[in-house]
């Protein structure tokens, strides 16, 4: 019997290499035990940096003694996109990666928040280099994450994303719901992102002479009258998996044929077999 080749997975994030979310993701991947894990993540938090990278100032890369067993780990004094660029162009230029994961982010990345998210920015960068990738985010707070059965689900997500062959490398944006009443997650849903987004309200924190300092961390939801599939899935306690598009087309989206092929592939995969029918919930 032929032994299945272990995947080579790069893990990054935007909350920083010491964040709880990336540690949780690594523990789940280690539990599933199907891949060799490499970590290249920012030394400090980089939330909201989108696809920004260090164009002028040098970026430092140094080995990092990660507390869990991984093949190798490095910390970067830059953004998640810096991490991906350094991984692809320097660290693994002679030994290609199979997949790049970003997360698990502390807070959701859905709707139009994708334009701001550095968690998602890393995935778009991976796709531009021809590498399949997945962004993973936990709504509200990483404390809401439910570990039961998630190691096998994340393995299925990874294997599906690597195996998916169509026109471009696949990028998935996965969001886990926040179950404030501790009710178990119901399954996973293939969705499309909508127009919902978080906007920051300027808050004056101090004044020094003529200079005023503000924060934009007070985030509020703005929801359109017609809820998106992604929004409804999360609201109904389902994990959402939405495709990301990195190619530059006039529509800046998947064609109807590409979307139908991807949706059909997803629904027939091991992911969908483990999920529940959402038609009544999302009608």
Curated annotation (Swiss-Prot):
Protein family (similarity comment): Belongs to the SurE nucleotidase family.
UniProt keywords, alphabetically: Cytoplasm, Hydrolase, Metal-binding, Nucleotide-binding
Cofactor note: Binds 1 divalent metal cation per subunit.
UniProt cross-references to HAMAP family, sorted A to Z: SurE
Record: residues binding a divalent metal cation: 14-15, 47, 105
Cofactor requirement: a divalent metal cation
Protein name listed in UniProt: 5'-nucleotidase SurE
Source taxonomy: Bacteria, Pseudomonadati, Chlamydiota, Chlamydiia, Chlamydiales
Primary enzyme class: hydrolase
Organism: Chlamydia trachomatis serovar D (strain ATCC VR-885 / DSM 19411 / UW-3/Cx)
